[in-house]
C-alpha cells in the first residue's frame, strides 16, 4: 500500500507540474524545476537554439526533464512487485537498530517535518495573497506566474499599473470599493527583495505629556507622525514627555521642507520652505497621532515581525525560511552529483587498479591541493553577474566535494572484487558494468548511507561560510551566512545574529545526530562478540 501511494504521489506531482507549466501556474515546490530552468540560461532553449520557437518563447527543458523523471519513477514503483522492493534481512535489522536510537530517530522525524514545511513554499511565506475575493471574482496571486496589476483591485495612482500590494489590500479588506476578502500567508513577506515598512507603536498623550508604550513612563526619544501610506511626515525628539530638540518634516514625495527647534516644550525657531503655509503642512496628519518608529533592524514582536527585521528591512523569519529552502535545494542537487562522480571513480579505481588507479590518485591529489577559497574568488571575479547563482556555487563545491569518498569506495571495491561471487560472475560471462552495478555497488550501500548526512551538513556549512565571507550567492538568495554577517556587524541588535546562529546550529545538530545514529546502526562491530 505504501509503495503504491508513493508511486501515485510521484505521478500526480509530475502531471500537476506539467499542467501548471502549460497554464502559467506557480505550484509550491513542484514548479521549482521550471523556475530554475527559466532563471538559468543553459537550462532552457530559446529561439537562438531552436529556430522553430517564437521570438518570445522558450522551452524549459530542465523542468520537463524533472517531470519526466518523476513520472517514470512513479510508473516504475507502480509496476514493480512489492516483494522486489523489500529490504534484505541485513538492512531490515539495521533499520530496526536505527529506530532504537531515539536521538537519531526523532531527529530524522524533525528534519522530515522541516522539509515538509519548506516544501509548502508560498503557502506559508510570501508577499502575494493566497486568495483575493473582489467584485464577485476569485484571484490566486500566489499560485500564478502572471503579475496582477493594482488597478484590478481598485488601487489608483502610481500603484495602479504596478503589482498590487496585498498587505495594503489586507488592511483595507471589507471596506467599500476594496476586496471583500484577502487571505495572506502566515508570514506575509518575501524572503528577499521585500523591504518591510518601519514597524510603529502608538504613543499616548495625557495632560500635555507624551507617554511611552507602557502608558506610565514619560517618553524619551524620537516620536513621529506618519502619512496614511506609511511615509514619515514629522519627526520630533522628546525628553520627559515634552518636545525638546530638533523637529523635521517631509512631504509625501520625501522632500524635507520643515525644521524647528524646541526647548522644554517651547518653540525656539522654525523654518518652512514648502507649498502653502507651515500651519497647513503641520495639519496634514492628525495632531496627537505620534508613534514610536522602530528602524531596521527592528526588534522581535514589533509590527508583524515575530523575529524582527535585519538591517535591509527583510523579515527575519521569512529570511530564515528562504535560507532553509536554499539549503535543501542545494543538498538535493549537490548530493547526486558528488556521489555519482565519487562512486564511479572509486569503483573504477578499486576494480581495475594498476596504472589507472595510480594515475587517478595523482589527479585527485593535484586537485585536492588547489586552494578552494582562491578558486572561488577568481571565478567570482571573472563570471558575469547574470551567471552567478546557486548552480555556479554548487559546481565549485562539487568540483572538490567528490574526492573524499573515492578512497573509501576504492578500498571497499578492492575488497569485494576478491569475493567468490564476483569470480563466479566472471566465469558465467558477466561484463564489467554488470559486475560493478549488480554485485559490487549494492555492497557499498552502507558507506553511502553513512556519508550522506555528513555531506548534507558539509554543503550547509560551506554555503553559510562562503556567504559570510561575501563570495557566495547573490543578494536575491536568502542565506544564513549573510544574515550571520549582518548580525555580527550590528551586535546592538542581538536578535539578528542569534536567529542565524540558532538556525544554523540547530540544522547541523539534527543532521549530525542522524548521521551518527546511522553510523552506529550500520556498524557491524557493535554487534560482534569475540570469545
Where are these regions (language model features)?
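Positions in alpha-helical segments
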Residues: 92-96, 221, 245, 304, ...
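Gly/Trp-centered helix-boundary motif
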Residues: 1-214, 271-339, 459, 476, ...
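Glycine/tyrosine- and acidic-biased, solvent-exposed loop/turn segments at the edges of beta-strands
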Residues: 199-284
Amino acid at each position: 500500500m505504501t509503495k503504491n501511494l508513493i508511486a501515485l504521489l510521484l505521478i500526480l506531482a509530475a502531471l500537476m507540474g506539467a499542467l501548471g507549466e502549460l497554464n502559467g501556474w506557480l505550484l509550491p515546490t513542484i514548479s521549482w524545476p521550471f523556475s530554475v530552468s527559466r532563471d538559468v540560461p543553459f537550462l532552457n532553449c530559446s529561439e537562438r537554439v531552436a529556430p522553430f520557437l517564437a521570438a518570445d518563447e522558450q522551452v524549459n527543458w530542465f523542468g520537463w526533464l524533472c517531470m519526466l523523471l518523476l513520472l517514470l519513477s512513479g510508473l516504475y514503483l507502480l509496476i514493480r512487485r512489492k516483494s522486489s522492493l523489500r529490504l534484505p534481512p541485513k538492512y531490515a535489522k539495521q533499520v530496526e537498530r536505527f529506530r532504537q536510537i531515539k536521538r537519531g530517530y526523532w531527529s530524522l522525524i524533525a528534519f522530515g517535518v522541516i522539509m515538509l514545511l519548506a516544501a509548502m513554499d508560498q503557502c506559508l511565506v510570501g508577499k502575494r495573497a493566497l486568495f483575493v475575493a473582489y467584485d464577485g471574482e476569485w484571484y490566486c496571486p500566489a499560485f500564478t506566474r502572471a503579475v496582477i496589476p493594482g488597478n484590478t483591485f481598485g488601487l489608483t495612482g502610481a500603484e495602479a499599473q504596478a503589482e498590487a500590494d496585498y498587505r495594503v489590500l489586507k488592511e483595507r479588506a471589507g471596506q467599500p470599493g476594496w476586496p471583500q476578502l484577502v487571505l495572506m500567508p502566515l508570514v506575509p513577506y518575501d524572503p528577499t527583495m521585500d523591504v518591510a515598512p518601519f514597524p510603529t507603536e502608538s504613543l499616548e498623550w495625557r495632560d500635555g505629556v507624551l507617554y511611552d508604550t507602557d502608558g506610565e513612563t514619560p517618553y524619551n526619544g524620537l516620536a513621529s507622525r506618519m502619512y496614511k501610506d506609511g511615509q514619515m511626515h514629522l519627526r520630533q525628539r522628546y525628553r520627559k514627555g515634552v518636545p525638546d530638540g530638533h523637529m523635521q518634516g517631509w512631504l509625501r514625495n520625501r522632500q524635507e521642507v520643515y525644521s524647528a527647534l524646541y526647548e522644554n516644550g517651547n518653540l525656539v525657531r522654525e523654518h518652512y520652505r514648502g507649498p502653502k503655509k507651515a500651519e497647513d503642512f503641520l495639519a496634514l496628519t492628525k495632531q496627537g497621532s505620534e508613534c514610536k518608529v522602530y528602524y531596521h533592524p527592528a526588534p522581535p514582536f514589533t509590527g508583524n515581525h515575530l523575529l524582527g527585521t535585519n538591517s535591509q528591512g527583510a523579515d527575519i523569519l521569512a529570511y530564515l525560511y528562504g535560507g532553509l529552502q536554499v539549503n535543501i535545494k542545494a543538498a538535493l542537487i549537490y548530493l547526486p552529483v558528488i556521489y555519482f562522480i565519487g562512486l564511479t571513480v572509486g569503483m573504477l579505481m578499486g576494480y581495475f587498479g594498476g596504472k589507472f588507479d595510480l594515475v587517478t590518485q595523482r589527479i585527485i591529489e593535484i586537485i585536492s591541493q588547489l586552494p578552494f577559497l582562491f578558486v572561488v574568488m577568481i571565478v567570482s571575479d571573472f563570471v558575469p553577474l547574470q551567471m552567478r547563482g546557486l548552480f555556479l556555487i554548487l559546481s565549485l563545491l562539487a568540483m572538490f566535494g567528490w574526492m573524499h569518498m573515492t578512497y573509501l569506495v576504492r578500498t571497499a571495491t578492492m575488497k569485494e572484487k576478491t569475493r567468490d561471487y564476483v569470480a563466479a560472475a566472471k566465469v558465467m560471462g558477466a561484463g564489467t558494468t554488470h559486475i560493478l552495478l549488480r554485485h559490487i555497488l549494492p555492497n557499498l550501500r552502507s558507506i553511502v548511507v553513512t556519508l550522506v548526512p555528513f555531506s548534507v551538513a558539509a554543503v550547509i556549512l560551506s554555503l553559510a561560510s562562503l556567504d559570510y565571507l561575501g563570495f557566495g550567492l547573490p543578494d536575491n538568495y536568502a542565506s544564513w551566512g549573510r544574515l550571520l554577517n549582518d548580525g555580527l556587524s550590528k551586535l546592538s541588535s542581538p536578535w539578528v545574529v542569534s536567529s542565524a546562529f540558532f538556525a544554523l546550529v540547530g540544522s547541523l545538530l539534527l543532521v549530525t545526530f542522524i548521521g551518527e545514529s546511522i553510523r552506529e546502526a550500520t556498524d557491524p562491530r557493535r554487534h560482534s562478540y569475540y570469545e
